[in-house]
Amino acid sequence: MAATLTPEQITEYKGIFEMFDEEGNGLVKTDDLESLMSLIGINPTKRDLANMAKDVDKDKKGTFNCEGFLVLMGIYHEKSKNQDEELRAAFKVFDKEHKGYIEWDTLKYVLMNAGEPLNEHEAELMMKEADKDGDGTIDYEEFVAMMTGESFKLTQ
């Protein structure tokens, strides 16, 4: 799966891995995985982090090697690519006229009627949080941040 990484990514990830290889034995402590991922700019949830730790430390020794880390990063990038494709497809569903943004009324209707419906107050809070530039529409970047939870914490 590391084959999905570019040579530049492999070099970068190996360098970061080596920074955490304190003993120079080709191993990093599983407990350091969160810090390592954070340095790369990836901030997984606790559940995702636990799953990643299981993936790289299959024998439960408390450490993982660089190859396992590169495989993990390949999987992460593949999932990210797939997620991006899904988000683009979802955005296009709402942006039927290809304006590059979603009208508030359209998004509000969907949030209140599809999937796990929100009430009107929750939908408005979510849209206000997502509309970072305050223009009354949700562009693709705002949509991605909203859908991935990067910009939104539902508070009541």
Curated annotation (Swiss-Prot):
It comes from the Eukaryota. Keywords: Calcium, Cytoplasm, Metal-binding, Repeat. GO terms for molecular function: calcium ion binding. Ca(2+) binds at residues 131, 133, 135, 137, 142. The keyword Calcium applies. Residues 8-43, 44-79, 82-117, 118-153 form the EF-hand domain. Expressed by the venom gland. It is found in: Cytoplasm. GO terms for cellular component: cytoplasm; myosin II complex. Disulfide bonds: none annotated. Transmembrane segments: none annotated. InterPro entries: CALM/Myosin/TropC-like (IPR050230), EF-hand-dom_pair (IPR011992), EF_Hand_1_Ca_BS (IPR018247), EF_hand_dom (IPR002048). Belongs to the calmodulin family. Calglandulin subfamily. May be involved in the cellular control mechanism of the secretion of toxins from the gland into the venom. This is Calglandulin.
